[in-house]
Amino acid sequence: MCRRWGGGPGFSVKAAGEADVVGRDHVSIYKSSEWGFRHFCRDCGTHLFYSAPSAGYFGVSAGTIDDLTGLAFTTEIYIDCKPDVYAFANPTRKLTEAEFLAMIAAPGNE
């Protein structure tokens, strides 16, 4: 999902609720699946966040956050789809596509 969207691994921060977006009138939304949406800047194309509203999931693109102090890279998703060309050195929780979809209760994956 993220690799095809951005050409490489995507880094996001799970929001506690729906993302509070300043300048929402500049945001376009692409429905990428039955349950998921990609939100991006309609002016420059920057990836802003990914949402699965029915599951209450909002992943904010890390590059859009001014201060990442105190945040840690803890989880890799879609690990079964990861290409062999890279591997992260730090220990992380690794979720397959099926495990991630079940975690966010995506329709059809209950």
Over which residues does each language-model region extend?
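A short Gly-Trp-Pro
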Residues: 1-110
